[in-house]
Amino acid sequence: MLKLNCIKNILKVSSILLILTQLSCSQYKKRENIIVASAGKIESLDPAQANTLRTLQILSALGDTLYKINKEGNLSPSLAKDLPKVSKNGLLIDIPLKENISFHDGSIFNAEAMAFSLNRFRKIGTLNYLLNDKIEDIEVKGKFLLRIKLKKPSSSLASLLTSVNLTPVSPDSYSNYKDSFNNKKFVGTGPYFLESFNSSQQIIKPFKNYWGEKPLNKGINFINYSNSSTLFGAIKTKEVDVLISNSIDDLQRLTLNNMVKKDQLKSGEGDPIEIGYITFKSNKLPLENKVVRKALSYTIDRELISQQVSFGTREPLRSIVPPQLHKKEFKPWPKYNPNTARSLLKTEGYCESEILSIPLTFRSNVPADKLLALTWRDQIKRDLSDCLEITLNGIESTTVYKQLSEGAFEAVILDWTGAYPDPEAYLTPLLSCNELNNNSCLKGEAVFSGSFWGDKKLQELLEKSEELDGENRLNNLIKVEKLAAQGGAYLPIWLVNPKAWSLKDISQPEFSKDGLIILKNLERD
């Protein structure tokens, strides 16, 4: 009798599990919106405040920019009707705008709306230096004609106008937010409108009055998970349709790539736009010593780190600009050479009786950071233990970003993605300095980057590049980076390709030139 009851209980449990499985499959099949998952919360959808890749990803679907970079790498009009028209003296830029475009609130997109958005960004934007360093004034010359007056000629402005941060917002909906951020809403001109928002989930739906190519799906649910394991589990159990690679553990990334090879998933990859690097605080000893910084530039075995940390998925990098933006092979930072490092450290009194100790901070919530820190520390122990030691300190990323400009870290692991695909979008945020005392930066982007390093000649070359075009401009920016390599305030480590994986019944993810998934092209079979 007891055995019979056990069998009945087993059958009951089996039936319940079967029903739950069928319900789960049924829910999966009936899913209308495509669910896209990434790591980290989204606290604000204001383009003037956006500074994370996940925020820019959703904004790219909710808004449009004046221009885009097409597949061939050339500037292409989007909200603009034609390419910018530049005056002979290079100080006036006229931008004709497309007509018959409306915002999600029904108001009309025109030159007044574009001027409102650009001026708002100039006033409160987190990255407002991008415009304020270049622009004198913005004028409305006609209902659909915008004029930008420059402080001096700028060859990079056109590329800058492709930045998602400069997507226009409706003056009607943002009339009370001219001087402050509108964190929980977004009203733009894009192919989707925002249906609901909280920091963990955002739902967007196709905008029926969209002026351009309509989305191929019925909507997107953005889900923001807290860690890599949850993201990895969600795509494996089909809880989500698309997984974005940001903050995915590299071992799990390798597993996902193997699932693609076995035809269990699809994947898409964009041009490498994210650089990983270490910043050295150069305004205080021992790292104020240029020879010490130069020695450190020889101490990192990028090939070893790439293999041990990322299984080769992160490409070793000896530049602070993604190579495709220079359009030529360029590696100004030196290769790994512990003997050269030892010789340089000996000239400064280390190795024989004194060991140089460098505290290295890594972001505790970024999986690759800790592995990089551990690998470098162990490599130093193996090759340079008589001269150098690395001590480790893990701090949550938001705290790191807040304290960078305070000079809280002697050495810190960071990453950077340019706001637009141009060398200047990497060089200026790391190297620009408005007030110098010898090689110590007192005011400027080099302070906010945590290096506090500057160079007068480098600054002159950065400014000169704005007067140049084409090959001459690229060659000038290469000179800038050579000086940065000699300064040694940054140590580039690797280059990261944006990647996404999708379930078999979802189309292969496609990426734009700015490293963002083209969400409107995602389609369920």
Where are these regions (language model features)?
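Extracellular/periplasmic solute-recognition and catalytic clefts
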Residues: 138, 195-203, 221-284, 307
